[in-house]
Design a protein with these regions (language model features):
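Short, well-ordered coil/turn residues at beta-beta hairpins
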Residues: 3-4
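FMN-binding flavodoxin-like domain, especially the glycine-rich phosphate-binding loop
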Residues: 7-136
Length: 136
């Protein structure tokens, strides 16, 4: 299982470097790719959720697998975390208007400055399905 959060429409640097470094080895193994991102809760009020999810799946999962010659047995797309405490000043300032949108979408602030859109049960179920595929 290889995964990443999506930050500014990209995989994190560490995850991308891992894929690049082990590309050859991973291409010969059963792999599963997943991302955690905001596609399920787009912050643009005009955005269509299904369109955002399809874009994220194609761009961050299918295209990523193709780039590294992977044939994943599963692709997972999950909600992400908005942690304003770990953002740089400019990024935090830019996204400060997002907080009311998150709350309006029913996403509570779980800790000061932290909004978590992940569904832990969905992630667990996906991981169990992947495990079963690997074992078969």
């Amino acid at each position: 299982m290889i995964g990443s959060g999506i930050k500014i429409k990209k995989w994190t640097k560490e995850a991308e470097q891992f894929l690049k470094k082990f590309q050859k080895e991973l291409a010969e193994k059963k792999t599963a790719l997943f991302i955690c991102c905001g596609a399920k809760y787009p912050l643009d009020g005009k955005a269509d959720v299904e369109t955002e999810i399809e874009y994220a799946r194609k761009t961050h999962l299918e295209d990523k697998a193709a780039k590294y010659n992977l044939q994943p047995i599963a692709l997972g797309l999950f909600g992400g975390v908005y942690n304003f405490n770990k953002m740089g000043w400019l990024f935090r300032k830019t996204l400060s208007a997002v907080k009311p949108q998150l709350e309006a979408a029913g996403i509570p602030e779980t800790e000061p400055g932290l909004y978590d859109t992940r569904d832990v049960n969905s992630i667990r179920n996906w991981a169990k399905e992947v495990t079963q595929k690997v074992q078969s």
